[in-house]
Amino acid sequence: MESVTLSLPEAYDLALEVLSANGFSADHAAAIARNVTAGERDGCASHGLWRLLGIVDTLRKGKVSPDAEPQIHDQAPGIARADAGGAFSLLAYERALPLLLEKARHNGIAALAINRCVHFSALFADIEPLTEAGLVGLACTPSHAWVAPAGGTRPLFGTNPIAFGWPRQDKPPFIVDMATSAAARGEIQLHQRSGKALPEGWGIDSQGQPTTDAAEVLNGAMLTFGGHKGSALAAMVELLAGPLIGDMTSAESLAWDNGAGGLPYGGELILALDPQRFLGAQAPEQLARAETLFMGMQEQGARLPGERRFACRQQSERQGSLSVVHCMMRFAPCARAGKARSAATRMPVKTACRARPARCSRHRPAATSSTYQRSDTGARCRTAEYRRPAHRCPAPGAAYNADP
């Protein structure tokens, strides 16, 4: 398969330039570029640069705001809320994260509800900042109704990912990030692009018959993992990140899309728990017991969740480059143009998952170390002069099938 090799800074520049050229504000473009570059760096091609195609397509269809400023609300002692205003979720999460961390450390447990957001990204990027802060994290979000319930033949659930993270001292965190469907939808789309057959059990066609044809599954329905067990977990996500936080279910998201083919719109729920507040002086001892569990898994030859991703990250950072498949070749000249820039003007991709000041012609990021740093109030400016008509999206609980 044809590919192009990009350095990590070039990959970030590619994403940033594509997003900016299509009308995203500086802050949103930087947040999205950090995320898709991190996915590519970590070997998660289904959530890497390839996602730019769907991101730009959703904007062109008027299904996402390119410049909405997130509104952060201190709702209750243990609850923070971020209204994304119809934009992608990433910037809203970055802006709300300091409040979530503060509440978790004060109360021992805290929740963040992100409302009115368009979502495409892997949840490990939302969980990892919590584990880096020494917290346990849990996140979930619905999507579009693409998945049939166990025993059913028509889409009702979304892929409904769940992510869980556990902090570890001087080691990569233990992070589970999984769809409740048998596979992520992006994986099926990549199979379709490459002409590969799907594994059995991933989906059914429009007549409810099992199939390994990716196109037939995309036109029919995906299946949950583990039959009725995955179906129950998918229903749980619908409730937790839908009605509980006043936002859409996957079926409502698809109805709101009204056939446009945009990315899912709705809410996300993130929980943060502080072991220090739960355990006090016993925290080191109890966290050490968790390490015994991990060792027991590895001694039997089991691979810890996230282990492959962190290995890919180390390899990408060691090599300093990525091989991007042909579906991104159309953007290669844009990335190559970035070679003429000084390295000091490029975003350090090693910390791509973390919030940083947006990059524009007036505010360039300074070189930083490889440790994770977060700027909560970093310099930001808006340079994208292109503006689309104002994006309109329903408030939670509104008529979801309204013409957008």
Give the residues covered by each predicted segment:
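Catalytic-core signal marking the mid-to-C-terminal active-site face
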Residues: 2, 6, 11-14, 250-344
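Active-site cofactor/substrate anionic-group-binding motifs, chiefly glycine-
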Residues: 50-101
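A generic, well-ordered mixed alpha/beta core segment in the N-terminal half of proteins
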Residues: 80-169
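Phosphate/diphosphate-binding glycine-rich loops and adjacent basic-rich segments that engage nucleotide
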Residues: 147-215
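Small-residue-enriched flexible segments
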Residues: 185-246, 263
